[in-house]
Swiss-Prot record:
Enzyme class: transferase
GO terms of molecular function: histidinol-phosphate transaminase activity; pyridoxal phosphate binding
Keywords: Amino-acid biosynthesis, Aminotransferase, Histidine biosynthesis, Pyridoxal phosphate, Transferase
EC number: 2.6.1.9
Residue positions where N6-(pyridoxal phosphate)lysine is found in the record: 229
Catalytic activity annotation: L-histidinol phosphate + 2-oxoglutarate = 3-(imidazol-4-yl)-2-oxopropyl phosphate + L-glutamate
Cofactor: pyridoxal 5'-phosphate
Single biological process term from Gene Ontology: L-histidine biosynthetic process
Full protein name: Histidinol-phosphate aminotransferase
Gene name in the database record: hisC
């Protein structure tokens, strides 16, 4: 006779904080327009789909991943413009890289610091690896509160400071001078700074330019990107660039063979056709401009924030009502209104194709 899982004595062996958590669940989006996950709406052209399929079909799937990953690291270094003295670390998505950095720094009393609201994986990875987490609220305009950040760094001496550039869910690209002063402060007390550039394809600048121009001020910075927003969310490939000595230490806690031969080859293929994805990003940036204008002209929208990503944050009178109304009209967006007090009344909208954006706008207007 099978014992009901709720009564299993073995459950007592699971950490209390883990048992209190909720597993991440991807809702069934069949029949819906997905505008909730910042995915690239464009697929590969048919000819490239066929070429990729043929290439993947020739892989030795009976063998563990090998030196082809070195080819991918070299290709990513060239694509990103890797600073001198740097190295590349691959991850099964950037989520894994966040966890690896936290694991490598997980000592008693160690702390992770990040602005909030921000990407939820920073706090979750800190919790799961046994580090403390300090969230420093942004300003009401979702800018960095420089004084509060510097005070928190001085007080908590964080092992890791995460800065999403641009930020999620606010799509904010923070002031360079402020960011550099925060990086300086973190470095002065021996901390690591992770610049999370998941949305770099849609931003007007990258921190890697600073890393090349001022290596001495950014020698403790790890820059993290993903191919998800490049257009390969289904492939799950993240990469981290930073000082070779620092990357080598994080690499020690990486599981062997963490990136499959399929992921590796698909990423190499994408980089060989980077012009296709660059054109898609250009189209999405143009669609973002149109979307921002339409949202600002829409009656009932209380505020629309500028965006440097493939998402737009808006404030509406009743976020829950608007979300449910859009869902009833077969459009999924992200209701972030309960994630943090600063996000009260806010929805996060993905920037899609012009046709997708038009459908989303119609659903939003009808749901306000």
């Amino acid at each position: 006779m099978t014992t009901p899982s709720a009564e299993l004595p073995a459950l007592a062996r699971i950490r209390d904080d883990v048992r209190a958590m909720q597993a991440y669940v991807v809702a069934d989006a069949t029949g819906y327009l997905k505008m909730d996950a910042m995915e690239n709406p464009f697929g590969l052209p048919p000819a490239l789909q066929a070429a990729l399929g043929q290439r993947l079909g020739q892989l030795a799937l009976n063998r563990y991943p090998g030196t082809r990953q070195n080819d991918l690291k070299a290709a990513l270094a060239a694509y990103a413009g890797e600073p001198a003295g740097s190295a590349v670390l691959l991850g099964n998505g950037s989520d894994e890289l966040i966890s690896l950095v936290a694991l490598a720094c997980a000592r008693a009393q160690a702390t992770v610091l990040a602005p909030v609201p921000g990407f939820v994986m920073y706090a979750m990875s800190a919790q799961l690896q046994g580090l403390g987490f300090v969230g420093v609220p942004l300003t009401a305009d979702f800018e960095l509160d420089e004084a509060a950040m510097l005070d928190a760094i001085a007080q908590h001496r964080p092992a890791i400071t995460f800065l999403a550039y641009p930020n999620n869910p606010t799509a904010t690209l923070w002031d360079e001078a402020v960011v550099q002063r925060i990086i300086d402060a973190a470095g002065a007390q021996g901390g690591i700074v992770v610049m999370d550039e998941a949305y770099q394809p849609f931003a007007s600048r990258s921190w890697i330019e600073r890393m090349r121009a001022q290596p001495e001020r950014n020698g403790h910075v790890l820059l993290m990107r993903t191919l998800s927003k490049f257009g390969l969310a289904g492939v799950r490939l993240g990469y981290m660039i930073g000082p070779a000595a620092l990357v080598a230490e994080v690499d020690k806690v990486r599981p062997p063979y963490n990136v499959s031969v399929l992921n590796t080859e698909a990423a190499l293929f994408a980089l060989e056709h980077a012009d296709v994805f660059a054109a898609q990003a250009d189209e999405l940036r143009a669609a973002r401009t149109e979307l921002l204008a339409a949202l600002r002209a829409m009656p009932g929208i209380e505020r629309v924030w500028d965006s440097q990503a493939n998402m737009v944050l808006v404030r509406v009178p009743d976020a829950a009502r608007a979300y449910e109304g859009m869902k009833a009209r077969k459009v999924l967006v992200k209701n972030v209104s309960t994630m943090h007090p600063l996000l009260a009344g806010c929805l996060r909208l993905t920037v899609g194709s012009s046709a997708d954006n038009a459908q989303m706008l119609t659903a939003l207007q009808a749901s306000l």
